[in-house]
Amino acid sequence: MNSHMLKSYCLVIFSALLLSLSCRRSRSEATLPSKPGKQDMEEVNRYLVRKDREVILNYIERKNLKMTESPTGLWYMVKEQGTGDYLKDNDHIIMDFECSLLDGTLCYSSSEQGPKDIIIGRSDIEPGMNEGLKLLRRGAEAIFILPPFLAYGLVGDGKKIPPRSTIVYNVRISP
């Protein structure tokens, strides 16, 4: 093998080696986790909603309740129909209530705090409660189960309702 061929052969080997090394990711690049994207967050959210629903269904079965699920995920059972028209936005009501966690821990009640004075759609209440009240009439009694996304969400209320809690309301609307 002459020296010219040997140089060419070495140059080809060196070029191939250099090319293969330059195309490789560095070890630190290959192991860095990516930031969660919108799709990842949506997948996590769907998973949490499914898990919350399973827990609620288990509670309903244990308590032998005959509840209905609304399209938004609110669970409700009207125990007493009440009279008149269904409640709507801007209706003023007085409501007796008990608010508890699925494990039975009582968080709030009208016997401790007095009845709630509410203007539907305008008072500072949970989205699920606002929705549920519109399913009732004056004098009605009902049970609402609010999954976290219709209640206090990821953070809870900062007082008695922990983060990501499903809450159960027993309510009675004054006639």
Regions found by a protein language model. Name each.
Residues L6, C23-P175:
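Cross-family detector of peptidyl-prolyl cis-trans isomerase
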